[in-house]
């Protein structure tokens, strides 16, 4: 657990629906200002072994999961679970058979992997798992996504020189075609794992985007935030 002591930026704000806002664009614009650019981003073309910068990486498929070897150290995904809820309230088993992408952050001594299952069918094609690997401590942190994108990103939200990760939880579509996605802040610990970033009062930091199917109707959009700073500066 990571504790933020004496934080003065906590805001709980729900938008006013009297005026239209494209909250998806507001979120994207905000996140772009906080992104940490990777030293290298590699999209795997099917290879099982490759060298990226000075790092040697290989992987193989197992009966349940994959085994990744990073500079001689083995990382086995079998039996691992996500830190975040992926769909609704439950964590997910890391069910993968393919290494899709590698992101290297040299200054942060981190690697980020996007892991998938191929060939996929139905809802399984909307799922991916993300592994953060600390090159110094060899610690692993797992997250999952469903219908919330395949991109891997690290951020600097707190100006504390500790990289952050933003988990995404999809809460499903209601009868009116309205979706809810919750974003939760995780930050790197001194041990190399990523854990929820919390206030001195043990409150986590999050924001929710509530939107209609395919973002077609802005009248149904809402944005709720309890974050370290105000994201929706329009105030509506």
Feature map (PLM): residue ranges:
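C-terminal motif of bacterial Sec signal peptides marking the signal peptidase cleavage site
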Residues: 5-6
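Acidic, small-residue rich beta-repeat scaffolds with periodic aromatic anchors
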Residues: 9-65, 162-236
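Acidic, glycine-anchored loop motifs typical of Ca2+
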Residues: 46, 50, 105-113, 156-166
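Surface-exposed loop/turn elements that mediate protein-protein interactions on large endomembrane-trafficking
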Residues: 67-88, 129-145, 186-198
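Short N-terminal edge-element motif at the start of the domain
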Residues: 77-109, 120, 134
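Repeated scaffold domains used in trafficking and secretory/extracellular systems
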Residues: 96-100, 148-155, 205-209
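Long, charged/polar, surface-exposed segments that mediate recognition or autoinhibition
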Residues: 108-118, 123-143
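Short helix-loop boundary/capping segments
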Residues: 134-160, 166, 175, 179-180
């Amino acid at each position: 657990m990571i504790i933020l002591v004496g934080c003065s930026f906590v805001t709980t704000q729900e938008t006013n629906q009297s005026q239209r806002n494209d909250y998806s664009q507001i979120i994207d614009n905000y996140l772009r200002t906080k992104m940490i650019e990777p030293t290298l981003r590699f999209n795997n073309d099917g290879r099982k072994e490759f060298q990226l910068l000075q790092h040697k990486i290989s992987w193989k498929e197992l009966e349940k999961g994959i085994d990744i070897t990073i500079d001689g150290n083995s990382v086995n995904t079998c039996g691992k679970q996500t830190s975040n809820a992926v769909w609704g309230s439950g964590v997910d088993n890391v069910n993968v058979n393919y290494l899709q992408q590698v992101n290297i952050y040299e200054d942060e001594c981190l690697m980020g992997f996007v892991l998938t299952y191929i060939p996929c069918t139905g809802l399984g094609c909307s799922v991916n798992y993300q592994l953060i690997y600390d090159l110094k401590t060899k610690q692993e942190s797992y997250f999952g996504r469903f219908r919330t994108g395949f991109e891997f990103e690290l951020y600097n939200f707190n100006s504390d020189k500790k990289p952050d990760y933003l988990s995404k939880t999809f809460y499903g579509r209601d009868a009116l075609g309205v979706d809810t996605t919750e974003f939760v802040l995780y930050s790197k610990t001194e041990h190399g794992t990523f854990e929820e970033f919390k206030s001195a009062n043990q409150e986590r930091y999050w924001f929710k985007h509530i939107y209609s199917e395919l973002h077609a109707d802005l009248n149904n959009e809402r944005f709720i935030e309890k974050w370290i700073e105000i994201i929706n500066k329009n105030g509506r």
